[in-house]
Amino acid sequence: MITPFHHTPRLPFAPTPIGNPSLTLPPRPQQTMTGKSSHKAPDLPRGLNFYADYSGCGHWRMIWPELLLNCYGKANIQGGTVMIGDKNFYQGVKTVRIQRQATESQANYIKWLSQLSKELNFKIIYEIDDIIFKEDIPHYNKFRFAFEDPKIRQTSMEIMQLCDEITVTNKFMQNYYIEKTGNKNVTVVPNFIPKLWMDRYFDLAKVKDNYQRNKKRPRVVYCGSGAHFDIENRIKQKDDFYHINDVIRKTVDKFQWVFVGGFPLTLRDLIQQKKIEYHEWTNLVDYPEYINRMNPTVFYAPLEDSNFNKAKSDLKFIEGCALGIPTICQDLCTYSTAFHKFKTGDDLVSKIEYLTNDYKKYTKEVKRARDYMKSRWMEDNINFYTELYSFPYGDPKRKNLNRLNGIS
């Protein structure tokens, strides 16, 4: 156990006593005390996280890595949303990591922090897992309004240019932010899933049984944010589902289409008629169990071809792999890791048929998906984050990060 309430981490317990006079056993031979503790505090990097949110993004990119680094004793990380202006708080800190900061007051804080970092010798990392420049945010995205103010763009850019490093989720986003900001120190840190959150819900026997029970009408499930749908009809439903809505309608009796979290407005009539299932979103804690209870035969993840979507991570693919469910993903660089991809609605239907028309083939794909997760559990990849908080950009000790990012 490490306590952060000092300039450097301290072990909050006393050295082992030389002997206990209340015991009947012979005491240990006395040793000469040197004044040094027999328990040396481990040399852990101390870091600070400043979150922009406590929802999915905050957990995937900040809170879960922080939790596991602390639990494994890999680092000593404190997180929160309050920006602290007492310089003594930053004594002994190696890294300050800030998530998606964009306002004028946040920019002023980062300017002060940047000056302090030179005095106290710590680095500042800007974490971003989405595109935040208005020209590349789709008009159907319900959160676009938050980035329409030119001042937000200006301050976001200024903050990213001040930071020593930017962390992103994929190669496309890496190149995007290098080009937009001029900051060359942009590092890809993929999304990883915590075992403690999602691992326990895989059950091969259940997946096989579900396949057999729904063989005549496979359950084709989509789980995702309402930001993928043109819910305000701004651009006549030309959203992430525009290119597949027709085939969903045509195959509504062949497949049991299931939507979780949102649905295309053009399919509202089929939902009202109960021909398509719709389920409300749930909280982050219950999410794995919730989507597992949808009894999916396959998952699918459509996206419009845009810079915004190319900068997305492969979350939907690895969520499917964690549950052992084959997942069919849009054929974009976003899902370069995916096993099954589609371009058009007809492609999607063909992939569904391919995966669901043979029990042995389906079982093989289930095991293949699950095997892939061996490389994407957060606990097994925590050293990516240990390196991130411990060493500066490009340092040879960043073996995992350098290998992934092509730094020799």
Language-model region placement:
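A charged, aromatic-enriched C-terminal amphipathic alpha-helix characteristic of glycosyltransferases
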Residues: K206, Y359-N402
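Acceptor-binding helix/loop patch of EC 2.4 sugar-transfer enzymes
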Residues: Y126-R153, L196-A205, R213-K216, S225-A227, ...
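Membrane-proximal helix-turn-helix segments that form the acceptor-binding/catalytic region
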Residues: S114-E119, A146-I166
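Conserved catalytic-core segment of nucleotide-activated headgroup transferases in glycan assembly
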Residues: D53-L68, K74, F192-M294
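N-terminal pre-catalytic "stem/leader" segment of glycosyltransferase-like enzymes
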Residues: I2-E104
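Nucleotide-sugar-dependent
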Residues: I231-D239, V285, E289-E319, C329-F339
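Donor nucleotide-sugar binding/catalytic pocket of nucleotide-sugar-dependent glycosyltransferases
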Residues: D164-I178, G182-L204, R219, C223
